[in-house]
């Protein structure tokens, strides 16, 4: 389910007041503006969600304008907002077919209030200046944490803003939701690329490359690497080896498997998640640095795996890193993924105008 309906007992309207069955007089809420922002790594369908939010808001009598934060929460802090109301319905509809983050994204995590009260006060200033009553934050786990913090702080500050988290992550690692918008399209890209690359390697394996290593995203969750298994068929044995973050890397067993596969099939296709790690928890590709979210910066696991194979087995290899290609491949997006990306955006607006707060839309 993507939405819900709340029953009420309002039966008539008089002089800008709602009269319910218990004769309570409730002033009608004035329509407010909304802010939508994108955060973290983008996808080929995140703009489909943006399209849904804007289209649903335009149909609601409780929302006037929808502003978009340029470069995510950073744009809101800098009061660098995009007024989407000046765009035609036709222009907004084009978002459904555009990969990347059309409004810009960021990797900026709000600290706890006691560590960065200045930022929270700045958000209140911007919200007040633009009559914001709704905040939609489209992102992964860190983004949902930000949405929760803003909802709590605005409430405590006496300027409550309805905050709704909209899921987006190609890693498919958010809790509660069955799957995450963005994942399906990347899974399709990886499975297709794995099958195509396998056919290439197989055709040259007699006299050239024996091993192909394909690196995909997925720091702590192996959903993307595992999706390469969809390439397997009766006539295609690749991928022969999939290295997941959840399964500790054992070099001895790995090398034996590579030799066994080549002996049997003549070539070996390996798909490895960027988060593949040793038993002690150290990433194979640990670069020794961290990103702006405090996560370890990974330096590329495919060349590391290739190095191990070359050093221990002396086999000719090629490796590839799908990197941004996998998450921006709109030309091969999954229709189910597109449908879900639109549905969660539409549901976010429905939840917000019905009075829900601190909610994460889930599938």
Locate the predicted segments by residue.
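Short, positively charged and aromatic/hydrophobic N-terminal segments
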Residues: 2-25
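N-terminal phosphate-binding or glycine-rich loops at protein starts, especially the Walker A/P-loop
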Residues: 29-80
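Accessory alpha-helical/coil subdomains and C-terminal extensions
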Residues: 66, 126, 137-139, 147-160, ...
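Glycine-rich oxoanion-binding loops at beta->alpha junctions
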Residues: 79-133, 142-143, 188, 195
């Amino acid at each position: 389910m993507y939405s819900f309906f709340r029953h009420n007992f309002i039966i008539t309207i008089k002089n800008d007041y709602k009269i319910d069955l218990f004769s309570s007089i409730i002033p009608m809420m004035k329509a407010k503006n909304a802010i939508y922002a994108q955060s973290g790594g983008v996808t080929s369908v995140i703009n489909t969600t943006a399209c849904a939010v804007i289209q649903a808001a335009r149909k609601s009598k409780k929302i006037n304008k929808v502003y978009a934060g340029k470069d995510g929460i950073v744009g809101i802090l800098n009061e660098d907002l995009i007024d989407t109301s000046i765009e035609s319905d036709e222009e907004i509809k084009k978002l459904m077919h555009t990969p990347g983050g059309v409004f810009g994204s960021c990797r900026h995590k709000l600290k706890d209030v006691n560590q960065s009260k200045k930022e929270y006060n700045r958000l209140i200033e911007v919200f007040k200046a633009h009559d914001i009553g709704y905040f939609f934050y489209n992102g992964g786990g860190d983004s949902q944490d930000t949405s929760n913090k803003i909802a709590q702080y605005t409430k405590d500050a006496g300027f409550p803003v309805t905050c709704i988290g909209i899921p987006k992550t190609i890693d498919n690692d958010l809790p509660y939701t069955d799957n995450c918008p963005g994942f399906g399209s990347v899974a399709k890209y990886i499975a297709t690329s794995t099958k195509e690359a396998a056919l290439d390697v197989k055709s040259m394996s007699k006299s050239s490359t024996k091993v192909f290593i394909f690196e995909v995203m997925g720091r702590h969750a192996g959903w993307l690497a595992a999706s390469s298994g969809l390439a397997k068929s009766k006539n295609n044995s690749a991928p022969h080896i999939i290295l997941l973050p959840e399964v500790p890397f054992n070099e001895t067993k790995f090398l034996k498997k590579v030799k066994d596969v080549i002996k049997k099939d003549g070539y070996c296709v390996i798909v490895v998640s960027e988060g593949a790690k040793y038993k002690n928890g150290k990433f194979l590709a640990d670069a020794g640095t961290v990103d702006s979210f405090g996560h370890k910066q990974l330096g590329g696991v495919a060349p590391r795996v290739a190095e191990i194979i070359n050093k221990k087995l002396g086999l000719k290899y090629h490796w590839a890193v799908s990197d941004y290609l996998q998450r921006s491949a709109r030309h091969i997006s999954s229709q189910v993924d597109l449908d879900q990306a639109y549905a969660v955006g539409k549901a976010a607006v429905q939840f917000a105008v019905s009075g829900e707060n601190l909610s994460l839309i889930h599938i």
